[in-house]
Amino acid sequence: MKRKNKKFTEIFIAFILGIAIGVLGYSDYGTDLINQFKISHTPPPKIKHYNISQLSRSKVSTCFTPPSGCTKFIADQIDTARESIYMHAYGMSDSLITAALIDAQARGVQVKILLDRSNLKQKFSKLHELQRAKIEVGIDKVPGIAHNKVIIIDKKKVITGSFNFTAAADKRNAENVIVIEDAELADSYLQNWLSRKARNG
């Protein structure tokens, strides 16, 4: 008798699971889950990696906080752009960096930005100010936090490090910024940026 009850229970559970899977598959929620699974499991492109000996031939600059001043360091680098700027950022609330990006757009530099989805709700995010300046700003909606802090200038210079583009990073936190002038390395970062953009549609 116990065996029959156990068998019945197993069949009943399998039946319920089958219905649930069927409903999910044909509902908007189920479709969203499936699409998110597809996006998150899309294999990333193969991007060239670099070792120290290769990078040692590049021109490298650094900035650290404290003391403050790295936002100006970054803004000055943005001011050197002549053709293009690609940014991938988690936090984007610094006024000086925002102004430098808007100035670059105004002088004819192609500026493209991908921001973490948290910027849609953050009170001090410069998302809308950048959009009003006609800068192409996309939201990185791929599952997980878009925690990159990267700026690619003229496809030959990379700004990266721990430094979020925020006032807190400049005034309160212990952070670092590194600028590497190397066209091949910049292309590696650009391919990663383009990959993230493509995965967001």
Curated annotation (Swiss-Prot):
Coiled coil, from the record: none
Catalytic residues of the enzyme: H147, K149, D154
Reactions listed under catalytic activity: a 1,2-diacyl-sn-glycero-3-phosphocholine + H2O = a 1,2-diacyl-sn-glycero-3-phosphate + choline + H(+)
EC primary class: hydrolase
Cellular component per GO, a single term: extracellular region
Signal sequence segment: 1-25
Chief localization: secreted
CDD domains: PLDc_Nuc
Keywords noted in UniProt: Hydrolase, Lipid degradation, Lipid metabolism, Secreted, Signal, Virulence
The organism's place on the tree of life at top rank: Bacteria
PANTHER family: CARDIOLIPIN HYDROLASE, MITOCHONDRIAL CARDIOLIPIN HYDROLASE
Sequence similarity: Belongs to the phospholipase D family.
Assembly and oligomerization: Homodimer.
The protein's name: Phospholipase D
Gene (name only): pld
